[in-house]
Every structure is written in C-alpha cells, then in structure tokens.
Design a protein with these regions (language model features):
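Short amphipathic alpha-helices in soluble, non-transmembrane regions
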Residues: 16-24, 168-174
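Short, glycine- and small/hydrophobic-rich beta-strand elements in well-ordered beta-sheets
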Residues: 1, 27-42, 128-153, 169, ...
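Catalytic micro-motifs at enzyme active sites that drive phosphoryl/nucleotidyl and oxygen chemistry
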Residues: 21-24, 87-89, 142-145
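A cross-family "folded-core" feature that marks the main globular domain of proteins
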Residues: 15-19, 31-34
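Short, well-ordered beta-strand segments in beta-rich or mixed alpha/beta enzyme
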Residues: 1-10, 98-103, 148-173
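Short S/T/G/P-rich N-terminal loop/turn motif that feeds into the first structured element of a domain
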Residues: 9-13, 41-130, 200-219
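Active-site loop/lid in soluble adenylation, ligation, and acyl-transfer enzymes
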Residues: 5-14, 22-28
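C-terminal structured interaction module
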Residues: 161-209
Length: 219
C-alpha cells in the first residue's frame, strides 16, 4: 500500500494536488482505496474557557450575536499567536514512521460527548492531554477536524522515529475516560515515511526508501 499526505492552505490547493496526481503516469498503476480530508486544528478548551469567563465579565449574553462576534475575535487572536500559528500552518513532520487513524466522539445513550457540559469536556480533555504530553519529544501529533468533510469527525496523525511509541501511546490512552467511554475509532494505517524523490526506490522494490530531512524554508 502507498499513502500520500498533502498539506495545503486552501481546498483549491488540495484539488490541484489531486488533479496533478490523477494526471501522472503512476496513477494508472494505482487503485484508490481510501481518502481523507480534514483541517489542522488545535485543542483550545482551556483558552475557550478563559474567553467564556472574559465575555461573561463584560456582561454579554451567551451565544447572542454580540457574544459570538466577540468570541470569534478573541479566538482569532489565539490562532495568530506564534505558538498556535506554527501548529495550524505546520508542514508534515519529518520523522521516519507514521500512524494515522480517524475517530469520532460517541453519541450513544448516556455516553454522548455532545451532551456533556463544556466544563466537563474541558476536564476530560485536560486529563487526556496529560498522557500525550508524557510522550513529548518521542512523538509528533497532528490533529485535524473533519466534521462536514469526511465520514469521521477527526483525523489523528502520529509521527515518530520508533514505531513502538505508537503502540505505547495509544495503549495508555485506552484507559483514559475521554477515549474509553466517549471515543470510537476507525481503521489504523501505519508505515514507513519516505521522501518523494525515493518513490522510484519504493516502486523498484529493491530497498527500503530513505527519509531525508529537509530544512524548513523561512517565508
């Protein structure tokens, strides 16, 4: 199997990449099996809670036009913060191994994520995030939202220099309440990541294609 991953700033950019892929000679030898479209996003429960408190202090009625406008403005400030902007407009992590899986939050009887109060969801995600942070430096995680774009609600990409890290991280998260009670997972895909110019090596089947780290270009 061969998985292509492409980041673009617009949907038109994704469409252009798809068109170019369809037109190349290699496409005639490939049989498409799956595709996934999503947008990079950040978990901002803590920041959102602070924004809610700020708007309430200003006397704004929850979810009124004034509230929504002020909320969007403050959230945009968060998106433009250097720490967050670098993650929202990231490039594909250049690590040797990759694992991808889609997931949903459950909406089943008492296990309905979307019926929980915001504060409870924030608490659960804080605990969930602590597990991920315990693997800091060992894995690069990219979360993307796909509600309205694909069959699942989120896509999770994990990149590491040791594939065993994927197993350890995902196993630990299985015991976290946000996952154990409220998460539903799709199929997992994992493999070796390699540079585009190593495609001929992969197709020849004579050696494992290499992953060459390319320095980021400052724009």
């Amino acid at each position: 199997d061969l998985m292509f991953t492409h980041y673009a700033r617009t949907f038109d950019g994704l469409a252009q990449a798809q068109t170019q892929m369809d037109r190349c000679e290699l496409a005639g030898y490939l049989e498409p099996r799956e595709s996934y479209v999503s947008i990079l996003e950040l978990g901002l429960y803590e920041a959102t809670g602070k924004i809610h408190a700020s708007l309430e202090e200003r006397g704004l009625k929850r979810f009124s036009p004034e509230w929504n406008s002020a909320f969007d403005e403050l959230l945009q400030e968060q998106a433009q913060h250097p720490r967050n902007a670098g993650r929202l407009w990231a490039r594909i992590p250049q690590r040797r191994y990759v694992c991808f899986y889609p997931m949903d939050k459950k909406r089943e009887g008492a296990d309905n994520w979307y019926m929980l109060p915001f504060e409870e969801r924030a608490r659960l995600m804080l605990d969930h995030g602590k597990i991920g942070r315990s693997f800091h430096g060992l894995v690069t995680q990219v979360i993307s939202g796909s509600i309205g774009f694909d069959d699942y609600e989120w896509g999770v990409d994990l990149y590491a220099d040791d594939p065993i890290v994927f197993k350890k991280l995902i196993y630990e998260m299985r015991f976290d309440q946000a996952s154990a009670r409220y998460a539903s997972f799709g199929p997992f895909v994992s493999g070796v990541q390699f540079s585009v110019d190593e495609l001929s090596t992969f197709l020849a089947g004579e050696a494992v294609p290499a992953m060459r780290v390319i320095e980021a270009v400052q724009v």
